[in-house]
């Protein structure tokens, strides 16, 4: 007797991709580091596929931050065997709300099985860094003028061309604009009186 297949909800797909697909940093040809974590280029996964998984992780954490913030794509960079995807938050986040913003990202990651690697409690430039079981590194950090940035670094994967992200920003796309403008969207919750 055959069982009917059910489609997974989008968040479940993101979690399976982020946590269940074995990937990790560059290592030996066999992919073993000796500590139970895969460390080589996994067969079948290339830079484009890993970049798409990074996009899904960034999209998921942004969806987990409530109330919503407006964001735009930052630059994509590639290295010998990996990719970094970025999102820039265009909503003004006041100094009083920055820790709340970081806490929401950190809580989302903890609930979804990410391991928190470091928390920077700097008053001006706080940040949270996490890693998935499959070797993706993700972070949220506040930088110049209090702008929040989200980044996802892939583990080492097979080299390939990498296309631009396909997710539509929830505000202006700022295509071919670098550097991106500073935060310019006000929020009753996130922006406060300062910002």
Ranges and model annotations:
Residues 1-13:
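Bacterial N-terminal signal peptides that target proteins for export
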Residues 57-68, 104, 108:
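Generic non-transmembrane alpha-helical segments
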Residues 44-63, 145-195:
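Extracellularly exposed regions in secreted/surface proteins, prominently low-complexity, repeat-rich
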Residues 34-48, 75-108:
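Terminal, regulation- and interaction-focused segments at domain boundaries
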Residues 65-74, 112-119:
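Short secondary-structure junctions
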């Amino acid at each position: 007797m055959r069982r009917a297949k059910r489609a997974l909800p989008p968040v479940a797909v993101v979690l399976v991709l982020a946590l269940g697909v074995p990937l990790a940093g560059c290592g030996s040809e066999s992919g073993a580091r000796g500590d139970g974590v895969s460390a080589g280029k996994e067969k079948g996964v290339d830079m484009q596929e890993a970049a798409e998984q990074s996009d899904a992780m960034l999209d998921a954490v942004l969806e987990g931050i409530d109330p919503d913030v407006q964001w735009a794509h930052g630059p994509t960079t590639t290295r010998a065997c990996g990719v970094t995807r970025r999102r820039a938050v265009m909503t003004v986040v006041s100094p009083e709300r920055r820790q709340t913003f970081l806490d929401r990202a950190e809580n989302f990651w903890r609930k979804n099985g990410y391991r928190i690697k470091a928390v920077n409690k700097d008053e001006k430039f706080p940040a949270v860094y996490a890693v998935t079981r499959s070797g993706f590194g993700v972070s949220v950090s506040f930088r110049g003028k209090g702008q929040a940035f989200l980044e996802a670094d892939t583990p080492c994967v097979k080299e390939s061309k990498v296309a631009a992200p396909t997710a539509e920003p929830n505000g202006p796309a700022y295509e071919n604009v670098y550097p991106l403008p500073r935060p310019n969207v006000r929020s009753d919750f996130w922006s406060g009186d300062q910002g």
